[in-house]
Amino acid sequence: MKRGIAILLLVALTLGISGCSTWVKNEYLSVTPHVEQSVPASETQEEETPLVTNRNELRGAVLSLIRNWTERGILLVRDYDGDVSSDLSEILDYATSEDPIGAYAVDYADAELTGSVRAGRIEVSIVFRRSAAEIGSIVTVSNNSAALRKIQQALVDSDTALTLRIRDYQQTDFEADIRDYCLEHPELILAIPEISAELYPREGVTRILELHFSYPESRDRMRTMLSSVNTILSSATAYVCTGKTDNERAALLHRFLTSRFRYEIEAETPSMPAYRLLCEGAAHSLSFASVVYAECVAAGLECRIVTGTRGGASHYWNLLCIDGEYYYVDLMRSVERDMRELTLLTSEQLKDEDYAWPEDDYPATPSAEEPPQPPDPTEPTSETESTEHSAEPTE
């Protein structure tokens, strides 16, 4: 009897287990070993406080606080070798007035020592005049030439600001370099920006150069306007390059710029020289000098922009090399006199007309009173005639 009851219980238990399998889906069950999640080191350990034992370590720690934009920092002092109070005062002065990044970024810094030189702490307080983002955006370059390349790219991109840390710094007129680059590359840069430039510190082998650029138009608008300028410059290049000799190419360029456009004389110096000349018909000596330079370079003619005065007023013109001889060319003079053909001018002729410029900075021109004039350029073909443009104002 007992044996029969045991058998019945065993059967019931077996059925119960198999019944469970009808509603518990084995494919939804998984067993994985438990892994203890480690806590990141940054959550278990506080950032280690800098420890200083001598002047060099103290200086490095203070400069590190500045570079990391730390407004309030703690330094631990242990068995300090030297006069920590005197060193601290000198280092703070250096960090805020002589160190390039400190001179650029810090308005004021102070520190307080508690304890002793054997076991103490220094609390450093820094007031920044630059944001952490501004410090982080500083670009380090090896010398002035590398700095100028960065500046040129910023101008091409129409950037509004650039901060450079220049090693092996040499005294340079960066504002003049910027202006020259803009004038020499009207195909890349539409406007000569207003420039704000500051150097930090005032003296030193390594300096911070902070530049800000202000433009007359938005970046998108300037790109559209530059496209219009390049359309006309490309047409001029195609026309000028039909000339076979230096003389012919120079004469064709003169004819393109003086005969194919209707100009009004502009009194104010333009901030967008090529656009004002080619797209709006505003004639200024700066505009002519810039466009002539760019077109001469494109046509393989040696050319320079000359800055000086005429009748005591600022004036710009060009120096061209024609078949190995140098001559001055002033297209503004041609427009004012309604001259359709190119006139090659010597230094003597310019001085007779009250031009003044640093003559020794440029190659000498022939001493002959009547320099050879270029021949009449060959009339353009029908293909080059199609490049004609009007300089009437655009909408």
What are these regions (language model features)?
Residues 287-352:
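Hydrophobic/aromatic-rich core segments of domains that either
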Residues 217-278:
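Secondary-structure boundary elements
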Residues 19-243, 355-395:
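N-terminal accessory/pre-domain segments preceding catalytic cores
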Residues 2-24:
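Sec-dependent N-terminal signal peptides of Gram-positive bacterial secreted proteins and lipoproteins
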Residues 276-286:
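Periplasmic OmpA-like peptidoglycan-binding domain that tethers envelope proteins to the cell wall
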